[in-house]
Amino acid sequence: MPPVTADRRQPLLVVGHGHRSAPPMQIVEAASGLCDLLWLIDESVPDGAFTSRLLRKVGTVLNIAGMTPREAVSSLQAYSPDGVVAYRDEDIVFLSLIAAELGLEYRTPEVARRLVDKLLQREALSNGGLSSPFCWEVPADRSPAVIESFAELVEYPAVLKPRIGNGGQYTMPVADAADLVRSVALLPTEAGGETGMFVEQYLPSLATERGERFGGYVSVESLVAGGEISHVAVTGRFPLAEPFRETGFFIPADLSEAQLAAVLEVATDALRALGVRTGDCHTEIKLTPDGPRVLEVNGRLGGGVPEMLLQASGVSLFGLSIRIALGEPVVVDGPIPCGGVGWRFLFQPPTSARRVVSIEGLDRLAALPGVNEIYVNRSPGDPIDWREGTRHYIYSVYGVSADYDELMEINRFLHEEVSIAYE
C-alpha cells in the first residue's frame, strides 16, 4: 500500500507496533474494507528497521525512535488520523497521550496508566468496591537488609511481580519472609523497570466443575464503545507451569451458567472501576472459594485470543476492535456462540532447563485432526530462562476441537508424545 495521501477514501487508523505485538497480517486482513493503516514503530530496536520495511508494504509507517508523544503528534497531524489502537501493553500510554492531543476517542492517559500499572490498578479496583488482595510496594533499594525488613511487613503466602509487565515475567510465589528475600535476590537488575516491583496476597484457587484438569482462572475479552460493555468471549486455562507460566488456553471456557454469570459481573465491575469507556480489554479472573476475583485487567486483546475465537466461532475480534477504534458504536450480544473449541497450547520447559538440545515429534503432532499451526519459539541451541515467564515457551500449537474431550487428547499428546531434551 502506498503512503496515505490527503485524498484518501477510507478512514485512517494509527496502530502501535513492536516486539510481541499482534500479528500484523491479521490486523491488515481485519482492516480490509474498513480503513487504511498507519503503523507506529521504533526502528532503533532489534529488528525494528526490518519490520518497518515489511509494514511499508501494507500501510504507512512512522518511525517514532526517540520521539516523545508530542513529537509524534506533530508528525501525525499531517495525516489527520481517525483513530488509534494498541495491541501490546507498551503502546497503551504512549497512544493515550497522542489521542488526547489529536482529540481522538481512546483511553485517557489516567485510565491508560491504570491499565498497565498493576499497583495503580489494584488501588482503583479497591476504590471501586471490588475485593482485592493486599499489596506492598517493594523498596527501590533492594539491598538484603532493606528487603529483610520489608519482608516482615508482608502477609503470606504472596506473589512477587512487576508493577508493569506481562506474561508472568519475573513473577514468583513467596511462602514466607525468607522466601521473599531469596526471590528478590534472584531478580536481575532490570526487573521491574522504572516503576519497580510489588507483592500481593496470593488468592487460593477453586477448581471448575470439570475438575482439576483445567486451570483455576479464566479471562474475559471485552469490547467497550461509548461506555457500553460487551463481553465477547471467556477463555479457559490449563494449569500453570511453575511458577506462573501459561501452558494452554481455550474458548469457550468450561464454566457452569452460575460461574459464567458471576465472572462476567466481576469483569463489568472491574472495567467500570478503572474508568474504561472505549477500546478492548482482557480481564483475568481467578475462581476462588470466596467467588471470582480479578487478577489483572489489560487494556488490549489477550495474546492468541483473536485466533482462538476465529477458529471456534468465525468472528474476527480484530475486526470488531478496529471498528470501535474508528468510532463505531459496536455492541455485541456475547459471549459469542462457538461451534467448537478453539485452543492454543504453549509448551513450557522445566525451571531447571537452561538450553534446548532437541525437539522430536512435532511432525506427528501436526498430523493430528484439528491442529492448524505449530510455531517453534525456542529451537535447539537456544537459551531459556524461566524468569522470563510465559514468553520463553518452546513451541505453540493452534487448533480447534469438537469438544473438551478432543481438547484433552491434544493436551495428552503434546505432553506424552513430543520429546524435548534440555541442558
Q: PLM ranges: what are they?
A:
Residues 101-170:
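A conserved helix-loop-beta module that forms one wall/lid of the active-site cleft
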Residues 322-423:
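Peripheral (often C-terminal) accessory segments that flank ATP-dependent C-N-forming ligase machineries
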Residues 201-204, 210-276, 280, 298-320:
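ATP-dependent carboxylate/phosphate-activation module, predominantly the ATP-grasp catalytic core
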Residues 138, 171-176, 223-225:
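Short beta-strand-to-turn element immediately C-terminal to the catalytic PLP-Schiff-base lysine
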Residues 7-9, 262-283, 289, 299-356:
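Active-site "cap" helix and flanking loop/linker of ATP-utilizing ligase/carboxylase catalytic domains
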Residues 1-111, 120, 127, 141, ...:
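ATP-binding N-terminal substructure of ATP-dependent carboxylate-amine bond-forming enzymes
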Residues 75-81, 152-154, 193:
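Glycine-rich phosphate-binding loop signature in dinucleotide/nucleotide-binding domains
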Residues 131-133, 153, 157-160, 173-212, ...:
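Conserved ATP-binding module of the ATP-grasp superfamily
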